[in-house]
């Protein structure tokens, strides 16, 4: 749907106006309760990982119904981005089911797998934690040496030149550039200069993500980038800036989303529906090519 990027972004400023509290209490929560009942979604604690195709279909239908009614709330403009069923179907129809990533000896197929598919999964390895500057390069090298690795989402930096990284601060820029250059250097040192990256996790802000886009020393066109949904079913201008830049620079965009069990989604039933709806949000709002899910419980 990248070819309709600006049409979708326009809705972040022209959609229906609504205060955030009303969006949550008058639209999102009531609609979630409605679709749980309508589609008879019921969690069985004795069977936490069901193999019920009918249940899976109903969760999907509930998520579509929920997303089309609720949309996505922009916290900066207080506007609700809404989409039609026809637009959603078009986006799903047009979405490729696989992409070629990396290059040369490290080119791989990053693609869809069916339920019970015997095809080998695409493996992105990541420690997903911060490292001290002195160990960062070595940590990247250690992961890149893994033979099963198809792509890397590298460690994060918590400090730069001994200073804590602060979002939207020059120190964040310095740390993110250091992260990007060290990751590229690590890939060269192990003989995998063209391996697929999902980067740069150290860059929290939109301006830092834009700053590390560089074919020579930073994140390249064709690499993966991440943009988060805001819990629940929300976004803001900074997230939209990231999503827009990723498409313009030629990167694969991944949507990060984590429905909170016991929060606005409710219990297991609502969490499953909400997490499925985030796939639709990623596709329509961020024009994302892949999804990373992390539903969680705060207790």
Give residue spans per PLM region.
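Glycine-rich anion/phosphate-binding loop at the beta-strand->alpha-helix junction
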Residues: 202-203, 212-299
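Metallocofactor- and cofactor-centric catalytic cores in central/energy metabolism, strongly enriched
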Residues: 1-213, 228-237
